[in-house]
Amino acid sequence: MCLRIGSLNVDEFRKVLMKTGLVLVVLGHVSFIAAAVLHGTMLRFVATTSDAVVLQYCAVDILSVTSAIVVIVAGISTIVLSRYLPSTPLRWTVFSLSVACALLSLTCALGLLASIAVTFATKGRALLAACTFENPELPTLAPDCPFDPTRIYSSSLCLWAISLIFCLAESMSAVRCAQLMHGLLELRPWWGKSCHHTIQASPEPLDAHDLLSCASSCS
């Protein structure tokens, strides 16, 4: 029972998968928290308006939450696969989730970038749609404003920038995971050298003896 992908033996490959899965889980949780904080501090107050810019903000936030959930699921699946490499259905599941994560995270990053650009272009006027001021150019605390209008602009831009960074990191990690699955599934085209032997379709994790025998036979 042996598996070798490129220069990695089974033990090394399992460790790489485990680390990749953990990275995806952490990034997904942070992105989810950032999107939730953004919704709680700003979007829930302006989401009732019919402004096109506000609708774009809400759509991007929903996409961010969806992307974060898919990334977390992909990370957990990758961690499980690191323990159960013989499972072919699980390999395809992780590969599909990784590709979906990469596309969703990239789309989310583009949406966040658009939100930041629109906010700069409009000077954040859409963020103050729920408030009424005598002078829109000088927002001050008002009884009919559900939040602090003097901080909503900088807070929103900061949260969007954080989410953008993590979406890009998610996309790169998902691409890395998809690359690992591409080699494990031996899909074509594949230019890396590999030594692949049949693995028994057993749900049990590979033990240390199997790993050592694999490393020696494929070296």
Swiss-Prot record:
Topology versus the membrane: Multi-pass membrane protein
Matching InterPro entries: Beta-casein-like (IPR020977)
One Pfam family, short name: BCLP
Keywords annotated in UniProt: Membrane, Transmembrane, Transmembrane helix
Location within or outside the cell: Membrane
Family of the protein in this entry: Belongs to the TMEM54 family.
Primary location recorded for the protein, binned into one broad class: membrane
A GO-annotated cellular component: membrane
Residues that span the membrane, as ranges: 22-42, 62-82, 94-114, 155-175
Protein name: Transmembrane protein 54
Signal sequence region: none
Gene name of the record: Tmem54
